[in-house]
Amino acid sequence: MSETKIVVACCQLSLAVGDAEGNRAKVRSAISDAARAGARVVVLPELANTGYMFADIDELRAAAEPLNGPTVTEWANLAAQHGLIIVGGFAELGDGGLVYNSAVLVDASGVRTRYRKAHLWNREKDNLFTPGFDLPPVVNTAVGRIGVMICYDLEFPEWVRTVALDGA
């Protein structure tokens, strides 16, 4: 049986709360660098559009974007331009002003899935983020099945087990 090498780039970035355009520029550069280095999959940090931590819900809400906002739209365009799969976290502004700690998986076809972090740690659930309630999604991609979770979700074995049982 032959092995297929898949290059995955995990981007560690210093992002600043309140600097949306600066954050997008840093992420854009990291994605382009990863593509030039041969990556097929690019993984961005949690809350890559906003940086992290927030003073209060007002600061968070001001920085959050809808799913079809400029950050996710740009990631989808970059995925198409470079032939990548991009998984990235963003502060999602939902209906009624609710804010979710979300992640998307995008590729050349656009947004394939969105996941809202279910397991919030103390500071996140203290009047900041609304928890998601769906199980982590698993998506068929050009490189195989990819599951999407965010940070603290990984500390819950049954959560990880569902993704593994679904083939990720």
What kind of feature is each model-predicted range?
Residues 20, 32-108, 114:
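Cys-nucleophile CN-hydrolase/nitrilase-fold catalytic domain and related Cys-dependent amidase chemistry
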Residues 77, 94-166:
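Active-site catalytic loop in hydrolytic enzyme cores
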Residues 27, 72, 156:
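Aromatic/hydrophobic pocket-lining residues that form the small-molecule binding cavity
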Residues 2-4, 37-38, 80-82, 99, ...:
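Residue-level preference for short coil/turn positions at secondary-structure junctions
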Residues 1-40:
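N-terminal active-site segment of His-dependent metallophosphoesterases
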Residues 12-14, 45, 116:
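Residue-level recognition of beta-strand->loop/alpha-helix junctions
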Residues 14, 48, 91-92, 153-155:
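Catalytic metal-binding/acid-base residues of hydrolase active sites
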